[in-house]
Amino acid sequence: MLKRLFVSGYKAHELGIFNEKNPGLAIIKKALKRELVRFLEEELEWVIISGQLGVEMWAAETVLELKKEYPHLKLAVITPFLNQEEKWKEETQDYYRNIVTQADYINSVYQTPYQGAWQLGEKDKFLLSNSDGILLVYDEENEGSPKFLSKLAAKKADNSDYQLFRINAYDLQAIAEEQQQELYNDSF
């Protein structure tokens, strides 16, 4: 049973998304929403993210929107270390803090500031071991930062009842085509 879902994927810059106006962002959010609604109908209770900019924060925005219709849904933000946002641009920090303050649970794997890249790998292991499944926006044909997490999740899924779900480039393309068809149909 999937009650705790870890959501992760590409960072915004890996997808070439630098602002809210990028048309690809709406497609990614629609894909996330579609999957989350499907899981909510199967008793999903928690969405867990680490607060990484990109897919994780877009998933958090989607969760906050879905909470209006699914009030039992909860958002957990478990960062790898304390104050991960402190070196980001002020505007980005404000965006991050606005979302994180609305989470139902906030914590850090390490109760210290950044000490090394190893904390990121340990964060992935921690979140995988404290969730029932992962939804990963990742396409193996377009490698990026989620590659390591994808391999860890696949290994865990192969050796247990852990569930690995992916949204890949083909899924996103299908949603883009649906939107184009809707626009076309609406024009008549």
From Swiss-Prot:
InterPro entries on file: YspA
Recorded hits in SUPFAM superfamilies, A to Z, give: MCP/YpsA-like (SSF102405)
| A Pfam match | YpsA
Q: Name the domain of life this protein comes from.
A: Bacteria
What family does the entry list?
Belongs to the UPF0398 family.
What protein name does the entry list? UPF0398 protein BBR47_29830
**Species whose genome carries this gene:** Brevibacillus brevis (strain 47 / JCM 6285 / NBRC 100599)
Taxonomic classification: Bacteria, Bacillati, Bacillota, Bacilli, Bacillales
